[in-house]
């Protein structure tokens, strides 16, 4: 069959953002209505290829060196020399997508350090429901084959349907990366390609944690527990996790490469990924014993210690309960006591699944909430608590805890409280590796809302954080894709502040909140408003004679001040203030001020108009000096935020981002002339809006002429 190039259609710009928000409100991005990645529709593309008799070739992830990588696997790397992209039909006469179901033997690592991803894929094979959410049914190299396949992945809060062609990297007729033990089975290699596509290249997959893959295949959130420092109620946590259908895995750390696959005295394998499949309390000789059931997915090597298959401990258990627990010999699954589990294993991972991943009606679901946010230098990237001058500008999210955990969940005798998990994930960092950007160091802190602010959607300011310690926080700030921590706090309102470790580190993030009981959440942001003094417009007769004399001297014969004259006047004035760091008012800045203050539309300022501008500038100068805290002659972007609020303006995060982008220097300093221009524009625009908002509903309607008049001359 001939090959035909299919070009994807991309949505860009503001319209794409609006479309995305609307579509999300309608349910787009949920698993049952996954987003078509890069706008590629699998069914349409496949039908087109079948109709035209061509095999699909994906120009969004083409078979070229750049798709392999950028450094170790870059275009000129020795590791990629001789790589040829071939279809399975060119390698085998009878290639298969899946043979006799997906199993762990379908996944063998190739020349890529993505064992973390392959371990996650292997774990998927233990759960058919989850597997076929990622690997949709009905794909093959026989019926309706068109060289096109698709997979569904969770990406930062949304499910995406990813289309790939089946051109795979080969050397000497063999797959370079993941392959099956049988050789002719290709679902795992094609899934790896789909994952490489969303991350920009195969090389971007090098290095990671299994939990990252787990989350992208389930949409869940992972908790980590070091078993040497296990919380007293860990067994209760495991019971509840299993009850909710969570995926649990554990392992024994290795101290060197030589320990890999080493078998302990009691037949546990180091460096291996074990699944936790059950937990049960049994009555043993009159005492309740906590047991945990394990599965070794890699083989039949089983634990031989207490409570293992055929051990004497089972003789002390009621036969009916023993039969219920289905103790069998040599099936890769075994029981052990929870005490031995803590002693023998090193690490436990719990991947909590979202409600849409759980089809069973028997499991108890988490309540989940997801927020997307950004850190932008100068406006919302304040760094951690170590930087008190800027920490407060970070995005803030409120949690309202109302219902305490069920009494039967209070294993270990702790005081009642509300359990929840917070997970902070940074977005798109793998994809940005080719540009030299790697994971930022991230974390979060949790603060209790003071009584006087309960129920108010107020973005907490600097003074609050200077006076109050955090109530809880992430266990560490670390350069991983996600940081997650389980908390248990009394009912009340709390504010979560996610941040990078250092200020001015930019990035996008997702903050997820998983609660045992229903809880209220909201993003905190200031409401846009201005508290402006009544504008005193004096008549010419009321203006001070000294000011009139000054004006006549400055304005010249026409008794009006032009843009150039205003620039000369203002720069002469500020040159006398040696404490101000400024390059002087630009012609464009002065034109802006004239356009905004010019009431009769002649492009010049008369006596009254200049008097209003003059008084404003004097007021702005006093504010500028007040908030130039280090007396540097300029304000930082963060000082400017406080100064703007002092001038009577409350703005939200997005507006501050725009202002800092527009009015700050590359080093985020704001000089006096830019500060004045910003405030003049803000005040005039607020007053303009207030004049048009006659019914005070916060909405005005423009015709095209008014809109152009406002935007072209503002």
Swiss-Prot record:
Binding site for Ca(2+) 3: 598, 600, 602, 604, 609
Cofactor remark from the record: Binds 4 Ca(2+) ions.
UniProt-annotated binding residues for Ca(2+) 1: 109, 114
Main location: cytoplasm
Domain EF-hand: residue ranges: 585-618, 615-650, 680-714
Activity regulation, short description: Activated by micromolar concentrations of calcium and inhibited by calpastatin.
Sites bearing Phosphothreonine, chain numbering: 354
Record-given protein name: Calpain-1 catalytic subunit
Annotated Gene Ontology cellular component terms: cytoplasm; cytosol; plasma membrane
Record's catalysed reaction(s): Broad endopeptidase specificity
Organism: Sus scrofa
Subcellular location, record wording: Cytoplasm; Cell membrane
Enzyme class name: hydrolase
Region (Linker), start-end ranges: 527-542
Residue positions binding Ca(2+) 4: 628, 630, 632, 634, 639
Molecular function terms, GO-annotated: calcium ion binding; calcium-dependent cysteine-type endopeptidase activity
């Amino acid at each position: 069959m001939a090959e035909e190039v299919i070009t994807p259609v991309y949505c860009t710009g503001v319209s794409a953002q609006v479309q995305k928000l609307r579509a999300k409100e309608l349910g787009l991005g949920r698993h049952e209505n996954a987003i078509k990645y890069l706008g590629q529709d699998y069914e349409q593309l496949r039908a087109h290829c079948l109709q035209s008799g061509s095999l699909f070739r994906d120009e969004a992830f083409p078979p070229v060196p750049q798709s392999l990588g950028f450094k170790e696997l870059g275009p000129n790397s020795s590791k990629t020399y001789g790589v040829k992209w071939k279809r399975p039909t060119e390698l085998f006469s009878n290639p298969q997508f899946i043979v006799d179901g997906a199993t762990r033997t379908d996944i063998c690592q190739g020349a890529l350090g993505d064992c973390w991803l392959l371990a996650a894929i292997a774990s998927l094979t233990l759960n058919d429901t989850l597997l076929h959410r990622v690997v949709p049914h009905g794909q093959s190299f026989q019926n309706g084959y068109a060289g096109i396949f698709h997979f569904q992945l969770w990406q930062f809060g949304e499910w995406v349907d990813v289309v790939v062609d089946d051109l795979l990297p080969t050397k000497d007729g063999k797959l370079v990366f993941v392959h099956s033990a049988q050789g002719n089975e290709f679902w795992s290699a094609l899934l790896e390609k789909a994952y490489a596509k969303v991350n920009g290249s195969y090389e971007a997959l090098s290095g990671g944690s299994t939990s990252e893959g787990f989350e992208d295949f389930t949409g869940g959130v992972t908790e980590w527990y070091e078993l040497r420092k296990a919380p007293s109620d860990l067994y209760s946590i495991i019971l509840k996790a299993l009850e909710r259908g969570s995926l649990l895995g554990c392992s024994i750390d290795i101290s060197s490469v030589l320990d890999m696959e080493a078998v302990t005295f009691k037949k546990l394998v180091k460096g291996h990924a074990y699944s936790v499949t059950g937990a049960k309390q049994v009555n043993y000789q009159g005492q309740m014993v906590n047991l945990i059931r394990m599965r070794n997915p890699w083989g039949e090597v089983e634990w031989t210690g207490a409570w293992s298959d055929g051990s004497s401990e089972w003789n002390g258990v009621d036969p009916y309960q023993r039969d219920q627990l289905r103790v069998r010999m040599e099936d890769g699954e075994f029981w052990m006591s929870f005490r031995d589990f803590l002693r023998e294993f090193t690490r436990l991972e719990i991947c909590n699944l979202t409600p849409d991943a759980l089809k069973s009606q028997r499991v108890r679901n988490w309540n989940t909430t997801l927020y997307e946010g950004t850190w932008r230098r100068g406006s919302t990237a304040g760094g951690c608590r170590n930087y008190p001058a800027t920490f407060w500008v970070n995005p803030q999210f409120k949690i309202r805890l109302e219902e305490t955990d069920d009494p039967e969940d209070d294993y270990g005798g702790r005081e009642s409280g509300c359990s929840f998990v917070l997970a902070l994930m940074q977005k798109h960092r793998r994809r940005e590796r080719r540009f030299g950007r790697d994971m930022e160091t991230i974390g979060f802190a949790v603060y209790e809302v003071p009584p006087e602010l309960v129920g108010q959607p107020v973005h907490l300011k600097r003074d609050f954080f200077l006076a109050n310690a955090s109530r809880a926080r992430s266990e560490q700030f670390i350069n991983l894709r996600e940081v997650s921590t389980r908390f248990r706090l009394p009912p009340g309102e709390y504010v979560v502040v996610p941040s990078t470790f250092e200020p001015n580190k930019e990035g996008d993030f997702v903050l997820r909140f998983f609660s045992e009981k229903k809880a209220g959440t909201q993003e905190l942001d200031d409401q846009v408003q201005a508290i402006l003094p009544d504008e005193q417009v004096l008549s010419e007769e009321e203006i001070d004679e000294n000011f009139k004399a000054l004006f006549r001297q400055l304005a010249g014969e026409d008794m009006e001040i032009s843009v150039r004259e205003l620039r000369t006047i203002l720069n002469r004035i500020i040159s006398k203030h040696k404490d101000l760091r400024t390059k002087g008012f630009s012609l464009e800045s002065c034109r802006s001020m004239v356009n905004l203050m010019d009431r009769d539309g002649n492009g010049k300022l008369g006596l009254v108009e200049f008097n209003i501008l003059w008084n404003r500038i004097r007021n702005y100068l006093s504010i500028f000096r007040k908030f130039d805290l280090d007396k540097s002659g300029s304000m930082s972007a963060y000082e400017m935020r406080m100064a703007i609020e002092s001038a009577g303006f409350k703005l939200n995060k997005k507006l501050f981002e725009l202002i800092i982008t527009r009015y700050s220097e590359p080093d985020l300093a704001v000089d006096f002339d830019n500060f004045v221009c910003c405030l003049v524009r803000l005040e005039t625009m607020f007053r303009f809006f207030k004049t048009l908002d006659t019914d005070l509903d916060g909405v005005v309607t423009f015709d095209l002429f008014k809109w152009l008049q406002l935007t072209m001359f503002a």
